[in-house]
Amino acid sequence: ADQETNTSNVHNTQLASTSEENSVETEQITTFHDVETPNRINTPMAQDTSSARSMDDTHSIIQFLQRPVLIDHIEVIAGSTADDNKPLNRYVLNRQNPQPFVKSWTLPSVVLSAGGKGQKLANFKYLRCDVKVKIVLNANPFIAGRLYLAYSPYDDRVDPARSILNTSRAGVTGYPGIEIDFQLDNSVEMTIPYASFQEAYDLVTGTEDFVKLYLFTITPILSPTSTSASSKVDLSVYMWLDNISLVIPTYRVNTSIVPNVGTVVQTVQNMTTRDSETIRKAMVALRKNNKSTYDYIVQALSSAVPEVKNVTMQINSKKNNSNKMATPVKEKTKNIPKPKTENPKIGPISELATGVNKVANGIERIPVIGEMAKPVTSTIKWVADKIGSVAAIFGWSKPRNLEQVNLYQNVPGWGYSLYKGIDNSVPLAFDPNNELGDLRDVFPSGVDEMAIGYVCGNPAVKHVLSWNTTDKVQAPISNGDDWGGVIPVGMPCYSKIIRTTENDTTRTNTEIMDPAPCEYVCNMFSYWRATMCYRIAIVKTAFHTGRLGIFFGPGKIPITTTKDNISPDLTQLDGIKAPSDNNYKYILDLTNDTEITIRVPFVSNKMFMKSTGIYGGNSENNWDFSESFTGFLCIRPITKFMCPETVSNNVSIVVWKWAEDVVVVEPKPLLSGPTQVFQPPVTSADSINTIDASMQINLANKADENVVTFFDSDDAEERNMEALLKGSGEQIMNLRSLLRTFRTISENWNLPPNTKTAITDLTDVADKEGRDYMSYLSYIYRFYRGGRRYKFFNTTALKQSQTCYVRSFLIPRYYTADNTNNDGPSHITYPVLNPVHEVEVPYYCQYRKLPVASTTDKGYDASLMYYSNVGTNQIVARAGNDDFTFGWLIGTPQTQGITRTETK
């Protein structure tokens, strides 16, 4: 409060007086309401010359929370067979054998409970912050390896198939993360943005952690064969908070975050006569040896009552803490200065575009949220939409129809499979115009994460190879993955494994694939056209020497086939049978280069290539595997690989894959290709679910300038537009557009009469199979928001005179059927008049976004209950409302292909 001025009062006194008005004053968060203005007394011309005012700044709570804390110290040992030293598996076939990792951390509780930060958070209710992570590396020059630090929001609270630990190596490296190379990095840093769907973290009642942070090994740790101190790598993990909002004081304290601090009470027992004699002897000795001290004690005791012999004291005794039920105060942590960023390509998912831009040229053309304009009229409307950046091309394309129903024409469900148009769904809401606002401040990134170019530009590891001193010159690298050093150039997935289960009479073989993000997108379409990009990185030491040749072979890929698979024919690709003198190639010298990024523009005698890929590939198929790819890259040594005995006799080759300038054509039925998401069973013996049908990243590029484009090509965007005009007639630029199209989730949903049935009985199954765009795309995002639309097509033959009706109700998502709940938002139709029941479920929710397929957070958004007075069969189709979207891009799941059963 301001000091009242009274120049006549020069003394430090104030006499009582009466004021005429009430006084209301606020000091910090406390408001005083006094009947009279209080008298105030202050020291006149106060001064303070204490050196404490100048020896240091006054540290705030926010500054304290921003101090880095040493969270963990890790030692990685080369050659160890422990699980925390194993590299990522290419596939995960059951949940008993998930992906191995070096270390994991649960955030933010790990940071909040370290370094005394919990005490600073005491007596506050809400916290919202980012978490910064810095790993400091200490490795000698004789050891090589590459790690991947990645995080996954709510990883332990989603369906198992959506966990980072139950997906492929390509899926893991598609999560937001950063590489750590033992020889190139002495430290890395990343920012994990606030990842909860709630507005703030509840410090009092909430122990809900929302991020799992993992440290994976991409390649084996390479060192000399003998285990010694030179085969170890030391890692120090620091974490701190940033972008902090700490609000709403409270008297409550969460004891799991803030430790108890108690007072130790010690009682001195009654002194006996023997004790008195001991004291008397001590006083005699003191009088003789230290007269001044003796006189002081006697003077102090002379005024006391001699009969008092019981003494009780309260002290803070560290010596006796072990015998008392009290928690000692944590010692003050050392004030570690906040480290500066050493690698600019770091950061949260909101910085993903920046990181990928260094790798995937053209990512800067991805639209930001809110980049919309009015439609432009032109001869070809979809071209005008693209040029004018209208909202439709980003997926805001299908408003509901509010016009009066035409009395003379009844075409229910018209155009339901189109991405753009007018929808006739009846909203189960209060307002017929129910619709959420724009996406600003919903997800951490301002970039449109559903743009096709953004998703396909997300790199993932497809190969981890090994080059040994014994490998032949001019022979393709064959160690490592099934395709070895042969890399098909194209968007489709070309790698798979066969999962086999047996019983007494039969053997079942199922294809399991490991798609990268661009391959995952390609699965939803029949044809593709793009510039394919491959980053080939060598994990080595300075003592490894040799040269690799990487050449592009256009057209057909030499392959061999088995009854279950397709693989390259390496015997046809040596230097004699396949000389590369006239091919586009790059020679990588291990002495000078660590990596190379190769861009291969689209080149073919066709405007588009097929998207089939490895799906169903075997010796019995009747299609050409090469129709899915424009050619192949081949990695083979052109010199011997050499090294001294003090280092490993091999190096690792890591191949990342992504796509630029992407065009995908003809949405295909999601049951006609490898779009069933693989749900890893619990054990290797368990059978898997089959369908009876035909069917963040922030890549730390260490050498941004080391990029080569094979052969000159015209402007890719111009060539793509020409191909679309000649062979497609439309363009899909955003995955959100697919969410506006209705796709079937059940061909024959049987509804018993006079029974309420929750739509989740159907959608929970569809979401696991990934059989419509909404469920399939949900696996590469962690959050969603917005309403859903459903169309029920009655297929039961009904008599004209039969009074049959179907009715839908708005309910909470995890609501139990209740026959009395009939008075909320609902819709009713009579199949004899209108065989299509069209409804929309709005997004009624406490939060601006929700986790996808959460197994613990239930009942937050609305759902649908369906009822019919007559038993009916329905074809059910689903789509997103015009405000529905996914956000927070993560890695891809594994997909499942053809299943074949044979008799033993």
Swiss-Prot record:
Record bears the keyword GTP-binding: no
The entry's keywords: Capsid protein, Host cytoplasm, Virion
GO CC aspect terms: host cell cytoplasm; viral capsid
Post-translation changes: Specific enzymatic cleavages in vivo yield mature proteins.
Pfam families per the UniProt record, alphabetical: CRPV_capsid, Dicistro_VP4, Rhv
Residue segments, region Disordered: 1-27, 35-54, 320-348
Compositionally biased intervals (Basic and acidic residues): 329-343
UniProt superkingdom: Viruses
Compositional bias of kind Polar residues: 39-53
Gene3D superfamilies noted in UniProt: 2.60.120.20
Task performed by this protein: Structural polyprotein: precursor of all the viral capsid proteins.
Family: Belongs to the picornaviruses polyprotein family.
Name of the protein in question: Structural polyprotein
